[in-house]
A protein has these predicted regions:
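Ribonuclease/tRNase effector modules and their secretory precursors
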Residues: 1-120
Length: 120
């Protein structure tokens, strides 16, 4: 039995503004987070600064899959202008727990921006 493909890489670019690599994926199956249908996910390379030996984009995508149909509250804002940031803790993958840091990109309700991932 083959695993259903959830994501398709549609863009890989280096952002001069953010000084980081960014990979954008389209969702190939219905994916819902906070009662919103998600169509795109962008992963930044911020995780490579400290966790390149244990984190990969593929692992992040597997963790994101586990958020399908989840509803969660954002973290308290540190600055009013910042987006609502979500930090689910303890997402299990291969008998280990991980933490993701992400938000809805550009106030979009269908695009998640994954900023970081690390062991929890």
């Amino acid at each position: 039995m083959t695993k259903e493909k959830w994501f398709k890489l549609v863009n890989k670019e280096y952002s001069q503004i953010d000084q980081e690599w960014q990979w954008t994926y389209l969702l190939l199956i219905p994916f819902i987070f906070n009662e919103q249908v998600i169509h795109k996910i962008t992963i930044t390379d911020h995780w490579k600064e400290k966790h390149k030996d244990i984190i990969t984009n593929e692992k992040i995508l597997e963790l994101v899959r586990k958020l399908n149909k989840e509803v969660m509250k954002p973290e308290p804002k540190k600055k009013p202008a910042w987006p609502d940031v979500f930090v689910p803790r303890g997402i299990e993958y291969q008998n280990k727990r991980f933490l993701l840091v992400f938000w809805f990109e550009r106030s979009s309700s269908d695009w998640l921006w994954i900023r970081d991932c690390y062991p929890n």
